[in-house]
Each structure stands twice: as structure tokens, then as C-alpha cells.
């Protein structure tokens, strides 16, 4: 039976039990000693594919560790899970859906059936629709109600309709096309809306409403506010269709809003929001960087898809990263994972991965509904280097928590300034080196004596200078941030997340916790506004509602 119907209890697999024993054997393992004893450790534990170099040599692993982790993947039927994903089986068991985001970057000519229909022609039809729209806007043919060309595009969406597109359009800023500026409106906070629209001219602004249901609370409220702003600023209602387009599966609601049928782009139920930047949800990306660069992004993701499905497990970049995550989460007690991009243009990468990973693998039951008694998805956090070095890296180096980290860095910068990039790259490497190597008590004492301190001062300060080391990290290196390797990078993490979900036996494609919060939010709103006189079900919520009602002046 398929893994998504009857997943394994991995704790009963022989490889899991062997890994538990191996973990005990690794109690005294030292990465510093491992490097000293093996000059080829980097060569043995690194991998180059799709424009990305993965150095995973600074991990708490031996050849035996990897052998056992690969055995775990095999015994958990990972090959079958990957095949099920790509064949369009209903791997999202709780919602009875396939998860075919990979089809969005498949080249024309391939064939993939969903409910008996080949979806690849439809995917490329929509891509052609995106191409045509982008061409009209970039050429100045699409004009607003006053016949001025569109110069500002505002994407209204939240979650996957926002985080992925924002990440890519910001990361590929050097590829930005002239003439059109893209903005993002996500939060249901009037301050964000006011600050954005204060900089816009309604005559030259186009809004993209990105919502599968055309009813997501934050997106709908911001869309209604945008329409009110457009009308208040003098925009005629009969010309609304020139200033609003939609990416949605609810065509009826979009048409009722005033959006022209020809300006509605479809969404499919086999694409989850956090995996949707490759679809028409990526329209703001294509507007920002141009269609040819958007297609390069798709090509990079497709290259990673091919690597993922064809490379042996022991040479498979997403699989190796996923297994290392399982190793630390389930056998070393790690509860979080740091994402540390050393590039200004990747400053939003961590935010995208937070949704991708935590919304996918933050689960506590298996696909069949049986409870898990092991940890699953870790907390994803981090930020851009070198800023983090002067903030939270202290915890990574000397804290009591084990926090595996991924460093991401390009070799070349689009903006060379003196020797800045050499220093940036050096800091990235040295942070990973310091996490691995640390500083012993003896080294700390020698360092302090060399500074001329008295022996009493040496003994007083030495404990504070000791850095434990042996902290694991990966380093991902690319030539420079470009559409192809960025597509590969994002797809790499998508596949990593899926592999972990398959091993844990959980559903990476639903998010029922998010849905509960939405439902309860409606109830609280009714009480806040006085529409419901019933008290909240707990005293804390009721007390805060009463405080709001007594103080609110909005």
C-alpha cells in the first residue's frame, strides 16, 4: 500500500534502530579530529549539481552514518514516495489531492495525467497567457483609465501568494526590467496599505489579486481597500478592469468584482500555495524580471527535479540534506535549523523557507491519522550575513542548543565594491569553520598568555573564551545569484522538505492548523465588533476582547 495511505512506523525499521546504536557510538565524535585524519573529507562529503555546490563535510557524520541514513530512506520506501509524487497520485491524503508543483516547470512534450487529463498543455497555455500579459505591460500597450501606461504593479496576496514571489523578485533584482516597479501587499494592517498607496498613482497602477479562493481574509480586505482607493482617487468604476487582474480558481467571484474574464489566470487544486511561485502566482516575478528570465527560473527548478528523480540516493542533494535533518532532529535532539544566506538579494529566503518547511512538516500525525511519538519539522529561522554574526551567531557558537545551519553564498557579486565581497565570502567560510572547530581551553589559555595577562586573569577568563565547536553546518555555493541557480535552490529545499515528510510518514501538503486559526479569528472578530454577545470560551480571550472594546477608537 502507498506510503500516503499506510505510512511506515519508522521507529520499527531496522535502520532506525541501527541509527540509535550508531548515535551512541558517535558520542565522542570530533569533526576537528575527522578533518585532521582525513585530508579528503571535503571531496568525499561534497556534491556539485544544477549550478550549486553542496559542502556537507562539516556535519556529525562518518561513512557509516550516511550508509545507515540511506538505508533508512530505502526501508521507508522513499523511491516509491518520489514516484507517487511525480505520477500525480493523491499524496495529499487528507484533502484527496495530488501535489504537482513540479509539473509547472516541466517542458512541453511531457505527459502527465490528473483524473485522466494531460495537464502539461494547460500549464503551458497559462504560461503563454502570462507571456502575453507581461509583453503588453512592458511594451506600454496595457494602459490605465487615462490611457497612461502601467508603471506600478501591486501583488495583493499572503502566504505562498506573497512569500515566494517576493523572494524571487527581490533575489533577482539585478535582472529587473525597466519601466515597471513591483510591490507586495500582504498584511491586513492599514499602515502597510497606507504607506504603499501613498507612493502610487492610480492612473498607472495595476493590482494583481492572488488568491485561490478569492476569499482569503487578508487578501480580500486589501483588495476591497484597493478598489475603494482607486475610486476615491478618481478612477471610474467602468474602467476597473484596466487596473485589476486575478490569479484564482474562483472565476465567478473575480468577475463579480469587476475583473475581465480574459484577465483571470487559473490556479489548480494540485498546487499548494507554498509551492505555487512557478505558476501564474509568479506573474509579478515575470513582470519584474521578464519572461525569458522567468523561464530560466523554471529551467533551474526542472534541472533540480531531474537530479532529484535520477541521482542515486547517496549522490542526491535534496535527499542528503533531508537525511541530515532527520539525523539531527531525531537522533541529536535539534529543535531548530538556521538558514544563513550571505547575500543581500537573498534576504527574504529564510522567510520563504519558514513557510515551506514549517507549514509542510509541522505535523504530529501520520498520513493515516495515527499519532507520532517522534519530532518532525524543526523551527526554521535565521537571516542575512554578516548581520547575524553581530546578533544570534553567539548562540550558535556557545549556546547549549544544537542548531544545524545552512550557509548560502555566491562566489561573485553584482555590485563589487572594493574588497567587500571577499570579506563577505571569508566571513561565511570562517563562521562555518568556527562552528566546526571551536576553541579549546588550552588554546584559550595560550591566546590569553600571549596578550600578557597574569595567570590569575588567564584562569578567570579562559572558561568564557572556550568555544565547544562540533556544531554542524552545510555550505551551499553558487557562482552568482541568477534565475537558473535560484530556481534550482528553491526546488532543492522543496524536495528536501518532501523527503523528510515521506520518511516521517506525514502530509507535507495540508495545513489544518492554519485553517483552525482562520475559523477562530472570525468568531473573535464578531465579539470584538459586538456582532456577537456570547462570551469567548476562555477568560483570557474574553478579558482581552473587553480591554480592546474599552480602549479602541478606530
Curated annotation (Swiss-Prot):
- Top enzyme class: isomerase
**What are the catalytic residues?**
359 (proton donor), 390, 518
Q: Please give the biological process terms from Gene Ontology that the record holds.
A: gluconeogenesis; glucose 6-phosphate metabolic process; glycolytic process
Named in its record, the pathway it takes part in is:
Carbohydrate biosynthesis; gluconeogenesis; Carbohydrate degradation; glycolysis; D-glyceraldehyde 3-phosphate and glycerone phosphate from D-glucose: step 2/4
Q: Which family does it belong to?
A: Belongs to the GPI family.
Question: Per its record, how is this protein called by name?
Answer: Glucose-6-phosphate isomerase
Molecular function per GO: carbohydrate derivative binding; glucose-6-phosphate isomerase activity; monosaccharide binding
Mind telling me which InterPro entries this protein's record contains? G6P_Isomerase, G6P_Isomerase_C, Phosphoglucose_isomerase_CS, SIS_dom_sf, SIS_PGI_1, SIS_PGI_2
- Which EC number(s) does the record attach to this protein? 5.3.1.9
Keywords in alphabetical order, please.
Cytoplasm, Gluconeogenesis, Glycolysis, Isomerase
Q: Which PANTHER family does the record associate with it?
A: GLUCOSE-6-PHOSPHATE ISOMERASE
Q: Where in the cell is it found?
A: Cytoplasm
Question: Matching Gene3D superfamilies, A to Z?
Answer: 1.10.1390.10, Glucose-6-phosphate isomerase like protein, domain 1
The record's Gene Ontology cellular component field reads: cytosol
Catalysis performed (reactions)? alpha-D-glucose 6-phosphate = beta-D-fructose 6-phosphate
Q: Sum up the protein's function in the record's words.
A: Catalyzes the reversible isomerization of glucose-6-phosphate to fructose-6-phosphate.
Top-level lineage group: Bacteria
PROSITE patterns in alphabetical order: P_GLUCOSE_ISOMERASE_1, P_GLUCOSE_ISOMERASE_2, P_GLUCOSE_ISOMERASE_3
HAMAP family recorded:
G6P_isomerase
